[in-house]
Every structure is written in structure tokens, then in C-alpha cells.
């Protein structure tokens, strides 16, 4: 059911071995979005360390094909308490393909600034 939580970018959940819904309580922390984002990326780093693949599915501020807020859809699907907010779902499983790292020659180093913005 979670594979329908967004109008695009969540259909692969139907084949995922594992889906981790990342939640936070906005009443407990004013930086809940940042905290949940850190938790999401740490899940992805741990999956990679285990030789697994992962994909972040953004839920906050997204909508289903029917226009229902994705967070509301996930709340109803999993009976999540109302005070908790859904930031993301991290799908984990065996990698469908191995991506090559970016070639350093093609990195946009002009977007990296040291000491001050615009300083060379």
C-alpha cells in the first residue's frame, strides 16, 4: 500500500524487502525535520555498509495521485499516532544496479567556497 503514497517516486516500494518510515514528534523538538533527515541518511549509510541498496522517498510536503497529502496517506495506512509527523520512507534491499562514482574532473568545484562565499 505504501507504494501509492506519492504520485511519483514510490512505486518501487512494492518490491522492496524493507521500508522504514521515519517519524518525528514536532512537539518534542523544533528541529524535528533536521533530526529525521539525519536519521534517514544514517539508515542509508548503514544499508550501504551492509552491502545493501536504499532509496529515500520524500513524504513531507508531497501528495498522492488523488491529491491527498502523502503524510496523511502513510498515517492512515499504518495507524500512526497523530502527534507524529512522517518525513520520509527509506526503502532497503539488494541493489538493482551498481552506480559508478562521479568522475572528479566533472565535479563543479566552482560551487565550493572556502572561508567566505565567493572567495578564491
State each model region's role.
Residues 1-120:
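Acidic, surface-exposed loops and disordered segments
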Amino acid at each position: 500500500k505504501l507504494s501509492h503514497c506519492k504520485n511519483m517516486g514510490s512505486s518501487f516500494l512494492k518490491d522492496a524487502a524493507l521500508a522504514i518510515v521515519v517519524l518525528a514528534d514536532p512537539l518534542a523538538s523544533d528541529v524535528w525535520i533536521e533530526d529525521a533527515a539525519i536519521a534517514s541518511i544514517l539508515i542509508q549509510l548503514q544499508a550501504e555498509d551492509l552491502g545493501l541498496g536504499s532509496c529515500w522517498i520524500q513524504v513531507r510536503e508531497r501528495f498522492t495521485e488523488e491529491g491527498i497529502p502523502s503524510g496523511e496517506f502513510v498515517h492512515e495506512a499504518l495507524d500512526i499516532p497523530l502527534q507524529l509527523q512522517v518525513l520520509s520512507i527509506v526503502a532497503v534491499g539488494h541493489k538493482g544496479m551498481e552506480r559508478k562514482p562521479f568522475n572528479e574532473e566533472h565535479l563543479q568545484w566552482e560551487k565550493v567556497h572556502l572561508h567566505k562565499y565567493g572567495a578564491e
